[in-house]
Regions:
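Transmembrane alpha-helix boundary signature
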Residues: 48-61, 73-84, 99-117, 184
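Transmembrane helix-loop junctions at the membrane interface of multipass transporters and ion channels
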Residues: 104-118, 183-188, 215, 222-243
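Structural signature of hydrophobic alpha-helical transmembrane segments
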Residues: 1-14, 51-69, 124-139, 185-196
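Membrane-interfacial segments at transmembrane helix termini in multi-pass membrane proteins
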Residues: 246-306
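Mobile "lid/hinge" segments at catalytic clefts and subdomain interfaces of large enzymes
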Residues: 209, 223-267
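C-terminal ends of transmembrane helices
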Residues: 16-29, 68-87, 142-157, 200-213, ...
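Structured cytosolic domains appended to multi-pass membrane proteins
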Residues: 285-463
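Cytoplasmic-side transmembrane-helix entry/capping segments in multi-pass membrane proteins
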Residues: 31-40, 60-63, 82-94, 157-169, ...
Length: 463
């Protein structure tokens, strides 16, 4: 295949990837966006296989079959509630792939057209080093994020003295290693960059709490894009450079949007420690307060006699896998002539769009799902707000308590509703570690129990 034809096909793939991003920006066009992405990837793979430098189609075919089989197995078995962990795992694979490609280019540079072992060009060494650095950080950071999201590692921030100073010194040490590697081209220095970068990736994610996980997932998405971009430079592959830049830039923009939704800077998220000692002290102030409790029958009666209900899903809904029961409850209320809407906070859940994905899986109509800016003005005119596992994003302390770690974070104004029904397992705090003032409001009724079972019991009572 001629170089011109390769360039045209790669450009077509890049355009399809851009269309895919555009399509995925809205639920109604997301299916078409996925199709664009798949077609673009198929064109990219076939074009790459047409290169004269391909030595063994059998090995490549075997890798595609094995990888495709694993991917299909995961896609068929994965539950929608586990998508954040899956995304983090995929990011780790991109990171380690960048490291492997850089290692292959370093040990066999002739195959990549960048020189011979020990005499690689300076620009190629710099590209290789940066790709390795970003890839290793992405790998270890994503693995740790996976553990936090999966629950195998505590989601609480882990902080220690001089943490940020140590991270800064390690970063400077890596820069020094990169300079030494460019000068000496030593395998020992190369693997030192890999190991130290992996350590830095762990240290960067360790102090970040579960409440910040949506931003972390976005940041890791950005890192994986830049890692792929680095691979593109190493391989002199324009499509990888373009695609990596698209993913890196979109992830960075999404991180900014998510941080803005929490009224925090990306830097403050990276520094971590969200929900530390200050949050812990804040929980003790409400220990002597009482809450009003109710049950499924009470909730069914209140909602059945209301004109409007806003449902506010959060991470608790995801954990309980209550989205289908919740949708069934909403359908029954709509049949009774009640106006039902769903309110989504931008950082609800553990990844960007987490609640949107779960509601879409339960076939909740797109037009009923509204974002914070679209729905907040409706709460004062709403008779009932049904909150299901959305803790920090509904906490009025974000507006009233200047000492609170979440102060300044935009929240859903559910407290302005006439009645708030709050479904929760217990009075435990959210990931921020801050007690929710909403629990103690006169217009709030707590519905303690499993979110899915509570919704199912409400459905029975409504029927």
């Amino acid at each position: 295949m001629s170089a011109n034809m390769v360039a045209v096909l790669y450009l077509l793939s890049a355009l399809l990837f851009i269309f895919a991003l555009r399509g995925l920006s809205h639920p109604e066009s997301s299916r078409l966006g996925n199709i664009f992405g798949v077609v673009g990837m198929v064109i990219a793979i076939i074009t790459t296989l047409m290169f004269k430098s391909v030595l063994s189609y059998a090995e490549i075919g075997a890798a595609i079959i094995v990888g495709g089989a694993i991917g299909t197995f995961i896609a068929l078995r994965i539950e929608m509630t586990a998508l954040p962990q899956l995304v983090a795992a995929f990011h780790s694979l991109v990171g380690i792939a960048a490291v492997f490609v850089a290692a292959a280019a370093f040990y066999d540079p002739a195959s990549f057209g960048i020189g011979n072992f020990g005499s690689i060009g300076t620009s190629s060494l710099v590209e290789m080093s940066i790709g390795t650095f970003i890839g290793a950080i992405t790998f270890s950071g994503s693995i740790l994020a996976f553990g936090k999201l999966q629950g195998t590692i505590s989601g609480k921030p882990i902080v220690f003295k001089f943490q940020h100073t140590i991270n800064a010194l390690i970063f400077l040490f890596i820069l020094a290693l990169i300079v030494m590697f460019v000068i000496n081209q030593s395998p020992t220095i190369f693997w030192s960059i890999v190991i130290v970068s992996i350590i830095l990736g762990l240290l960067v994610v360790i102090p970040i709490g579960g409440a910040d996980m949506p931003v972390v997932v976005s940041m890791l998405n950005s890192y994986s894009g830049w890692a792929a971009c680095g691979i593109g430079f190493t391989l002199s592959n324009n499509l990888l450079i373009i695609t990596g830049a698209l993913v890196g830039a979109s992830g960075a923009i999404l991180s900014y949007i998510m941080s803005k939704g929490m009224n925090r800077s990306i830097i403050s998220v990276v520094l971590g420690g969200f929900g530390g000692e200050q949050a812990a002290s804040a929980t003790s102030d409400n220990s002597d307060k009482v809450v009003k409790q109710g049950n499924a029958e009470d909730a069914a009666y209140i909602m059945k006699n209301a004109d409007s209900v806003i449902i506010v899903p959060g991470y608790g809904m995801a954990v309980a896998q209550a989205q289908h029961a919740l949708r069934e409850m909403g359908d029954i209320l709509k049949k009774e002539g009640i106006n039902v809407k769903y309110a989504i906070h931008p950082v609800a859940g553990r990844m960007p769009g987490h609640m949107n994905v779960l509601l879409a899986e339960a076939n909740v109509p797109y037009e009923e799902v509204l974002e914070l800016d679209e729905i907040n003005h409706d709460f004062p005119m709403t008779e009932v707000s049904f909150v299901i596992g959305a803790n920090d994003v509904t906490n009025p302390a974000a507006k009233t308590d200047e000492t609170s770690p979440i102060y300044g974070m935009p929240i859903l104004d559910v407290e302005k509703s006439q009645t708030v029904l709050f479904v929760k397992r217990s009075m435990a705090t959210g990931y921020s570690g801050v007690d929710n003032e909403l629990f103690y409001r006169d217009n709030t009724t707590m519905l303690f129990g499993d979110a899915k079972k509570m919704c199912e019991d409400i459905v029975k009572s409504l029927n």
